[in-house]
């Protein structure tokens, strides 16, 4: 589990391509203070397992599913990436609960300067937007952010100068593809609210309101 507070910007040193998978080697600095083989590291928000460590770099395998669901389809050598180690049980929790399981990718369609902040607007597929709510949390390339507004097909977030300087969002522009992970709590709530709501021949589909009443929420 992660918090969405990026620890540093690393850099892709090499990419070894398999038939449908990747083995990527990444150079970092801060994260190596206690990193060991088997640890989890979020790379642009994608949870990967460290397989080798040496000389300021670590290697991790990327499965076909992770490639298909993320921007790793276009990953390049020397590309900067956001890095975060899995959180410790006794550590501070500065962002929100991030699983490192990317739901899909989005595309930046607007970048707007507003006083000391940059507002990014991201276009996302319906499978992601279904879980995007006003003032809710979302992870963009591993960064915990708050949704300031939404439409049916896009949402906007405001980025402070510190986040811009400490993450790869500082160099993001219109057209940049990003990894998106919605709030896991919202995903679970929607899943459980939909349980038993599927229609059958002798049981019509229940509305969300009737389910809330039936379960004592309203």
Where are the regions that the model predicts?
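Conserved loop->alpha-helix
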Residues: 1-218
């Amino acid at each position: 589990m992660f918090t969405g507070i990026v620890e540093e910007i690393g850099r892709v040193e090499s990419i070894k391509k398999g038939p449908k998978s990747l083995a990527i080697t990444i150079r970092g600095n801060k994260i190596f203070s206690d990193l060991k083989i088997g640890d989890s590291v979020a790379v642009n928000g994608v949870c990967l397992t460290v397989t080798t460590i040496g000389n300021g770099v670590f290697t991790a395998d990327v499965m076909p599913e992770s490639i298909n669901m993320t921007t790793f389809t276009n990953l390049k050598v020397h590309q900067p990436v956001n890095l975060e180690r899995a959180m410790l049980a006794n550590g501070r929790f500065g962002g929100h609960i991030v699983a490192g399981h990317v739901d899909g990718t989005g595309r930046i369609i607007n970048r707007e300067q507003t006083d000391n902040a940059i507002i990014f607007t991201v276009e996302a597929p319906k499978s992601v937007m279904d879980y995007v709510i006003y003032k809710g949390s979302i992870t963009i390339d591993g960064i915990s952010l708050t949704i300031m507004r939404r439409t049916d097909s896009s949402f906007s977030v405001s980025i402070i100068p510190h986040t811009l300087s400490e993450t790869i969002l500082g160099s993001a522009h219109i057209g940049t593809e990003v990894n998106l992970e919605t709030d896991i709590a919202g995903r679970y709530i929607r899943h459980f609210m939909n349980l038993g709501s599927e229609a059958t021949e002798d049981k019509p589909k229940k509305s969300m309101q009737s389910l809330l009443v039936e379960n004592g929420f309203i």
